[in-house]
Amino acid sequence: MAFVHAAEIRVLGTTAIEDYHAHLLRLDRASRFPGDERGVDAHCLNLLASGAILIGAYVKGVMRASAEIVPDRTARRAEAAITIEDGFYDRGFERELTAKILDEARRCHINDVRVHELSTSRSYKVPTFEVHTHSA
């Protein structure tokens, strides 16, 4: 666990899907990847089925930023996404979540990870990038 500006960063797996679902619903509707509430429901169900890894940044017990890592069928490549709620951008979450994504990718022997920052913000935008983690 890591602490960033009074937040706790935890690797959760899909055990925290309810926290993640609530976090996605708190995002600005325009920046929400799955769209409406039904889209969020479907996205969370897909995460459960895919064996995704969830990472949460909790502030006072509430998930305010997150990362999801979704491995492909080979479990050697993955797509990852970072979301941050309004009012929580300038706390270093994007850096910590990106580091956790890379740590988990290495731990799970995932060789290629493509990271997307899904929340729209003028103060923070991570470009899509591909990371090659050379696992031993």
Model-identified regions with their sequence ranges:
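Conserved beta-strand in the GNAT
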Residues: G56, G61-P71, R77-E79
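A short beta-loop-alpha structural element at the N-terminal edge
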Residues: A6-Y20
